[in-house]
């Protein structure tokens, strides 16, 4: 047989094998994703989604304003004794404990598999995905920049480790997704600062804060990096679907891998996320902040007040203690525990200790919320300005927690 013909036949056979493997791999992925989606939808509650259950799970999607809701709504309603212990890296409480009534966490929806079925209501806030990506990038830079007070990365890392082991509070470095994003950005900031010192450069010409590569990782580099691709891309959808890299589901990694490899399979994930949103007690929108806050007070706040009054639980915990349980993980976006200078300024302006929960009404709740949010924003602004000074002239405008 002619050698050219042999080569042609060999190439054809090789192509058929590769194609067969590709089809088999796609079918495998399709089966994996469809099985997960079917099981997820099958376990969705058929009960009245408008009625507040015994446990309120606030699924905090990062950079949507959830910290404001926690401090200015939920901490005004629930005493610290009713808060579930933090579950920032693993479940830290017995879900059957009746006294535990409020869980606020960056954990994804998969944690609900550990919560009392039929006795848990879920609430969340969503934000325009593009704005949320910008804000995630900016917050990664803002927190990482706080470490630049140290002479080098080794010093910063060691000090952070010592403070985290000494303090009972929860650091941002313990919280998903910041426990991945901040160290990555921190290492990059120190590398760029060291490079500037080596070159002896201090003149920066770019006026675009998202493209100042001499000072900070450009936004384009950030969003195209595998770390951001794993955590930030479609982050809210994966969080609501329970498929983040912090998921409690053993199949989550494979499902996420298949969806990343075959984008059309993402529709199954989207349908599960949409169904879960539809079954939640409340879904707010960052862009419609005022309207969403008013709705939260009337839909969720009113039921919490009624529920706690009936159980004689409201009004007994206005003075929030400073125990580990009372140290809010949502404080992590202000409570960095990175160095003594930062730590000295870590105060919460929401005046948790001054709230009288007796005779609480929706109207009083909204009045308290307005005062609280004003103070909280001032604190966040001061902290943001102080942090960004360390990477001047880079500066950002978006600011939602």
Task: Please give the residue ranges for each predicted region.
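Membrane-interface amphipathic segments in extracytoplasmic regions
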Residues: 2-401
């Amino acid at each position: 047989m002619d050698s050219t013909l042999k080569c042609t036949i060999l190439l054809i056979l090789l192509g058929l094998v590769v194609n067969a493997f590709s089809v088999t791999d796609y079918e495998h992925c399709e089966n994996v994703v469809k099985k997960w989606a079917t099981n997820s939808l099958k376990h969705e509650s058929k009960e009245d989604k408008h009625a507040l259950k015994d446990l309120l799970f606030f699924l905090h999607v990062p950079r949507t304003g959830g910290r404001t809701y926690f401090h200015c709504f939920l901490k005004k309603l629930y005493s610290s004794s009713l808060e579930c212990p933090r579950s920032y890296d693993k479940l830290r409480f017995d879900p059957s404990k009746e006294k535990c009534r409020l869980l606020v966490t960056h954990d994804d929806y998969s944690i609900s598999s550990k919560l009392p079925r039929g006795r848990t209501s879920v609430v969340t806030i969503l934000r325009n995905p593009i704005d949320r990506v910008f804000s995630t990038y900016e917050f990664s830079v803002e927190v990482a920049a706080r470490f630049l007070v140290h002479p080098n990365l080794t010093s910063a890392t060691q000090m952070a480790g010592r403070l985290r082991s000494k303090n009972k509070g929860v650091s941002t470095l313990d919280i998903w997704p910041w426990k991945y994003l901040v160290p990555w950005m921190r290492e990059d900031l120190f590398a760029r600062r060291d490079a500037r010192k080596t070159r002896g450069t201090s003149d920066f010409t770019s006026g675009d804060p998202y493209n100042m590569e001499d000072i900070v990782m450009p936004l384009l580099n950030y969003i195209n990096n595998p770390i951001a691709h794993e955590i930030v891309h479609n982050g809210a959808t994966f969080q609501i679907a329970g498929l983040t890299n912090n998921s409690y589901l053993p199949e989550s990694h494979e499902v996420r891998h298949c969806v990343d490899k075959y984008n059309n399979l993402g529709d199954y994930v989207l349908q599960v996320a949409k169904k879960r949103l539809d079954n939640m007690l409340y879904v707010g929108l960052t862009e419609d902040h005022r309207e969403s806050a008013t709705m939260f007070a009337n839909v969720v706040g009113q039921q919490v007040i009624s529920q706690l009054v009936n159980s004689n639980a409201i009004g007994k915990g206005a003075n929030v203690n400073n125990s580990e349980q009372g140290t809010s993980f949502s404080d992590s976006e202000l409570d960095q525990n990175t160095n003594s200078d930062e730590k000295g300024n870590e105060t919460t302006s929401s005046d948790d200790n001054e709230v009288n929960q007796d005779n609480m009404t929706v109207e009083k709740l909204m009045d308290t919320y307005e005062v609280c949010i004003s103070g909280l924003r001032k604190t966040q602004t001061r902290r943001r300005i102080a942090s960004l000074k360390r990477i001047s002239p880079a500066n950002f405008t978006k600011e939602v927690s």
